[in-house]
A protein has these predicted regions:
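P-loop NTP-binding module
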Residues: 1-222
Length: 222
C-alpha cells in the first residue's frame, strides 16, 4: 500500500512530508487530506498544514474556518494551539492557511516557519504539508530544508509529461527527495489508499467546536 511504502521508504520512516503538484487543479489538497487520514488510520497523530498561501483549499475539504491559520502563526505570532483544528477524523488535526498575505514566500522561508515545524514534529507522529504547485511558485523548494520528501500529484491525461520531468529535475536539483507520484483522475480497480477518495472539494466532517478542542489537545500534547 502507498501509506506503508511512504512510511518505510527512508530509514527511520517519514516524519514531515510535503504534497505538491506540477500545475494547479491536480488534486494535491485532496491527496494531502487523504494521506493524513490513512496515516491516522494506523493509529498516528497527524497534523495537516495548508502552506498553499496563494490558493488555500484544505479548510474547504474539511469544512472549517480559514480566519486564522498558518499566516497567523508566522506573521502575527499567534500560538499554534489557538489555530490547530481537531477534526472528527480520529487523529487528524489541521492548520488552515489563514488570512491572505502579500509575501507568502518570505513567511514560508522564515525562522518562524522552521520553529513551527520543529514544534509540530515534536507533538505529532507525522506532519503533512500542502504546498503550491511547483511550476506556479518556488515555495515548495523552500521545504527542502524541512521535509523528509515530496509526494508529487499529477492528473491523468492532463499533466504534460515534459512538465512532469521539469518538476522532477527542479526538485532533485533543489535537494528535495521525491517519495512518490500520485496519479489523480484515473479510476482504479482497487482502492489505491485502502480508503475511499475524498473528491477534491468534498468536505470531511469537522468537530462542532474545533477551536476549543484544538486548544485542549495542543495543551495536552505540550
Amino acid at each position: 500500500a502507498f501509506r506503508t511504502s511512504l512510511l518505510f521508504s527512508r530509514a527511520g520512516g517519514v516524519k514531515i512530508v510535503t504534497v505538491t503538484s506540477v500545475l494547479p487543479r491536480e488534486g494535491k489538497s485532496a491527496t494531502a487530506a487523504n494521506l493524513a487520514v490513512v496515516l491516522a488510520q494506523l493509529g498516528r497523530r497527524v497534523l495537516l498544514v495548508d502552506a498553499d498561501l496563494h490558493r488555500s483549499r484544505v479548510h474547504e475539504v474539511f469544512g472549517i474556518s480559514n480566519r486564522a491559520g498558518l499566516v497567523s502563526i508566522l506573521a502575527e505570532g499567534v500560538e499554534p494551539s489557538r489555530v490547530i483544528v481537531k477534526t472528527s477524523v480520529p487523529g487528524v488535526f489541521v492548520v488552515p492557511a489563514g488570512p491572505e498575505t502579500p509575501n507568502p514566500s518570505a513567511l514560508l522561508s522564515s525562522e518562524n516557519m522552521r520553529q513551527f515545524l520543529a514544534l509540530a514534529a515534536a507533538n505529532f507522529d507525522h506532519v503533512v504539508i500542502d504546498t503550491p504547485p511547483v511550476l506556479a511558485t518556488y515555495d515548495v523548494l523552500v521545504f527542502g530544508q524541512y521535509t523528509d520528501g515530496v509526494v508529487l500529484c499529477v492528473r491523468a491525461g492532463v499533466t504534460p509529461r515534459d512538465q512532469v520531468r521539469e518538476v522532477r529535475d527542479k526538485l532533485l536539483r533543489g535537494g528535495v527527495p521525491i517519495l512518490g507520484v500520485v496519479l489523480n483522475g484515473r479510476k482504479l480497480d482497487t482502492d489505491y489508499y485502502e480508503y475511499r477518495y475524498l473528491n477534491y472539494g468534498e468536505r470531511a466532517a469537522a468537530t462542532e467546536d474545533p477551536s476549543r478542542e484544538s486548544e485542549a489537545e495542543a495543551g495536552a500534547a505540550s
